[in-house]
Amino acid sequence: MQTLRCPACIGRLQPSRESGSQTRLVCRECGEEFPVIRSIPRLLLSPFREALLGNGTAAGTDAQQLETALSFGFEWTRFPEMYDEWGRSFLEYMQPHTAEFFRGKKVLDAGCGNGRFAFYAAKHGAEVWAIDLGPAVEVAQRNTATAGKVQVVQADLHKPPFAPDSFDFIYSIGVLHHLPDPEAAFQNLLRYLKPGGEIQIYLYWKPEAQPVKRALLTLVTAARKITTRLPHGINYLLAFPAAVLAFIFFVWPYRIMSRIPALNAIAQKLPMKQYSVFPFRVCVNDQLDRFSAPIENRYTRREVEAWLSRAGLNDIRVAACYGWIGNARKAG
């Protein structure tokens, strides 16, 4: 209760349970009540509370954000698997940090998906608070059950239910670019970062000097105008042939060419080569992600650097990693 706060007013919460009913968290300041369902606090405000926990709807940008959350909830319930390869992937996305960095730190996973990164952050010794807006929290709860100190919370990234200055480290990997106003959501997260703490983000890149990747992205963007309007189940079926094509044209050629010294330099330029070290279903999962998420924003290195600079952060670093990894430190 020291960390969790009311998302409406940042007031302190206290548990309340009447005989025979579920536990609820009640705000001492404004009186808002939030259910705890299957050990997950559901700290949602309207319209997401009604839409995700009841039978309500949302409109405008809220509707876009809701559909995005439901799309990813569908995705992670279809692809709940945890792979050993995620451990290497976790550290790749956390560069320049190593596993030792996480020991003893209080960490926020802002957009936890199926919980794969929260799992490894906890395994490396962190106390992790993992939030997501949609039904993916159920998968994350199961996947992190044996990881250590992980608390999954269902909440809106625009209104995180935490006390200010709560976390030593905040990361948001592959999430912000799916929001209606990504930079505003990013800046909002800084309120919950301790002075001197670090924030780490991963954003899709906008290819500038890579003609093959730029051409592929043009095709994907054109296809998304259709696929984002399709039912989730249809996109799930389409993700399989899309992954097969990726393996035929890029992954398998990379595996062969990278073993031939004379062709290795060409192999390293192939798109989608990262799937060569993952099971096929990971590629299918990512194709579903690519074609079904309603909102997708992409950025250049300079744009990511500008985000971090406008936020008044120090020690700014931006590195390429199948996109852009941005890391910076809050003053203090």
Name the predicted role of every residue range:
Residues 161-163, 180:
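GHKL-family ATP-binding catalytic core of two-component histidine kinases
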Residues 183-195:
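A short glycine-rich, Lys/Arg-flanked "PGG" loop and its adjoining helix->strand segment in the class I
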Residues 198-229, 237-239:
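Conserved class I S-adenosyl-L-methionine
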Residues 214, 226-297, 301-309:
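Substrate-binding/catalytic lobe of Class I Rossmann-like enzymes that use SAM or dcSAM, i.e.
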